[in-house]
């Protein structure tokens, strides 16, 4: 498995959790159990995509952890929630060792959902792409999500469509006839979130999200600047990673690494 190879590779410090649907946990174990070496003391950390029945999902996770810890540990849960009650009921059922991220839609009750996450001490999730152009939210929609979470002190993660550091126009899948579209950059997202925490205006944040040229961002030991003027220092970046955007998900590990190497950042 690629994940097993990447865990022992030179950039394993960048690697987070393996994402697996709750319904496929047993299938995952059957395929991954031979990838654990006897000397592996850390084990695989898993983020589980919840099924329709959240109580059944939590039960599956609890049983899985009892059987296979410490080689495999489910310590994150990703839940789709469209109502306040879904967030509240899930939060009240979570074991202490399971952190949840709630994927919430930007509909009429969006602000109420973010407020509920804040009250419950939970985290949010935003979907930033897919396999068709219409699956990608606009920069303005992402900024609204980020500013709302920032104002409510709700950390979040992002998933899908973030294979590349900077905004670009690329094929959306690996198929020969794949549709092409504009993909958001994970550096754009992280840095925009950092500047949102410094109370930048929406039009400035939109410019950061839509930057396509590496020269716009300058990195050094002290932090990162945008056009040589506005800066995020190391402490602000540390706080951003802890209390702002925690992680992003990508189908590919090689593409983000190779792109960062091409930019001279690795």
Feature roles, as predicted:
Residues 1-266:
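Expand to "…catalyze enediolate/carbanion chemistry for C-C bond making/breaking, isomerization
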């Amino acid at each position: 498995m690629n994940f097993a190879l990447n865990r022992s590779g030179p950039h394993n410090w960048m690697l987070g959790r393996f994402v697996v649907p709750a319904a496929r946990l047993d299938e995952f174990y059957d395929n991954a159990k031979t990838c654990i070496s006897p000397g592996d003391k850390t084990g695989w950390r898993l983020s589980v995509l919840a099924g329709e029945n959240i109580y059944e999902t939590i039960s599956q996770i609890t049983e899985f952890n009892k059987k296979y810890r410490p080689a495999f540990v489910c310590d994150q849960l990703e839940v789709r929630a469209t109502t306040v009650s879904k967030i509240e009921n899930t939060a009240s059922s979570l074991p202490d060792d399971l952190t949840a991220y709630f994927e919430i839609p930007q509909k009429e009750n969006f602000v109420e959902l973010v407020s509920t996450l804040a009250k419950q001490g939970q985290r949010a999730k935003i979907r930033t792409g897919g396999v068709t152009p219409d699956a990608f939210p606009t920069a303005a929609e992402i900024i609204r999500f980020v500013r709302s979470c920032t104002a409510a002190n709700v950390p979040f993660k992002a998933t899908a469509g973030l294979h590349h550091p900077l905004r670009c126009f690329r094929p959306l899948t690996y198929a020969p006839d794949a549709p092409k579209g504009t993909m958001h950059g994970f550096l754009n997202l992280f840095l925009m979130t950092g500047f949102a925490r410094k109370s930048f205006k929406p039009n400035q944040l939109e410019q950061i999200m839509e930057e396509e040229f590496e020269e716009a961002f300058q990195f050094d030991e002290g932090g990162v600047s945008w056009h040589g003027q506005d800066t995020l220092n190391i402490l602000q970046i540390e706080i951003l990673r802890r209390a702002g955007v925690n992680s992003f998900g990508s189908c590919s590990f090689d593409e983000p690494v190779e792109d960062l190497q091409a930019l001279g950042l690795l």
